[in-house]
Amino acid sequence: MDIIKIQLDVAIKIYNYIKSTGTENIIIAPCSIISSLCALSKLTDHSTADKIYDILNIECQNIDLYMKKINDNMNSSDIDYFCKLGLNNVCINQRTKNILYNCYKTCTVDETEGCSIKFKNVLEFEALWNRPFTAPTEEQIRKRHNSVEIVSILVDAKRRLHMLRRLDNIGCSVVRTSLASNRYILTTISPNEDKEEIFNLLENSINVDSLLDWIDNSKMKKAQHRLKIPKIKMSSSYDIVELLKSLGLNLMEIKFSNVFPETTLFVERIAQSSIMEIKAESISLNTDIELEFTNNEYPKINCSSCSETVVGKPFIFILQCRVTGNCIYFGVLRDSF
């Protein structure tokens, strides 16, 4: 299995759905979502598990090994990653507990109240820029929907080497820079001119093959460049139940055949919430993913949303581990006020 292809495919499926709801700023943690759904599959009946693997395009024969490779890489000095499975009035056997812990970094705890089955996946990432931004920020005035806001743009004090590529066919550029003493790579893709129609063309060009092409180091060159990125703090939250249903995975009612006693439960909520902050010294992203199942037939209503944010020129970003290539985050940011 091609790990990065699977992760980008999941990210794009989620991105396309969230964009269709009218949400403008989108932050996705594909590894966390894949891990959460695959951990859930260890408790469900075979039919549901197979549907999960199908929408993720993952071979079920190697699923535990695949997830172990991802999750072993998800804890470091820059990443804090863990998942908790809370069980109320049900239990699982020791073999399943061991698989969840060793391959999915999921510890199992007994709960006395609340949902019958609840997964909570937490990903906290913070990395220093290889070179902090020391120059004064550039203030930009942004006008949108008859409103005016000001954004502070972090700018390198002097030119330095980055990996660059011009996408002349769509009027955009790709910039790759290293984080945390070269342990991670941040790729940004943005229009050369601050025009909405160019960014719309860029967004419409997003697919797995195009992203893999854009981040291909062999097609880039080292060049002197001043990195510019907005100084922001923003939040986003997405409902995943309807997204999964649109992909053919209906989790509204699930048979849990690998818990004792065997039971059928209804979804309470499946949601991802993220906070992103970009500062002169570092970049941080924190994400919670919750999957809750109860006897209640009526789920909570969770709407996709993002905080009002001003970012200046819009851009796509991809955050990867340099060694493994894992796509830790994928996002699209634009003014939303």
Curated annotation (Swiss-Prot):
<dbReference type="InterPro" id="IPR042185">
    <property type="entry name" value="Serpin_sf_2"/>
</dbReference>
<dbReference type="GO" id="GO:0004867">
    <property type="term" value="F:serine-type endopeptidase inhibitor activity"/>
</dbReference>
<keyword id="KW-0646">Protease inhibitor</keyword>
<dbReference type="InterPro" id="IPR036186">
    <property type="entry name" value="Serpin_sf"/>
</dbReference>
<protein>
    <recommendedName>
        <fullName>Uncharacterized serpin-like protein FPV040</fullName>
    </recommendedName>
</protein>
<dbReference type="GO" id="GO:0005615">
    <property type="term" value="C:extracellular space"/>
</dbReference>
<dbReference type="Pfam" id="PF00079">
    <property type="entry name" value="Serpin"/>
</dbReference>
<comment type="similarity">
    <text>Belongs to the serpin family. Poxviruses subfamily.</text>
</comment>
<dbReference type="InterPro" id="IPR000215">
    <property type="entry name" value="Serpin_fam"/>
</dbReference>
<keyword id="KW-0722">Serine protease inhibitor</keyword>
<dbReference type="InterPro" id="IPR042178">
    <property type="entry name" value="Serpin_sf_1"/>
</dbReference>
<dbReference type="InterPro" id="IPR023796">
    <property type="entry name" value="Serpin_dom"/>
</dbReference>
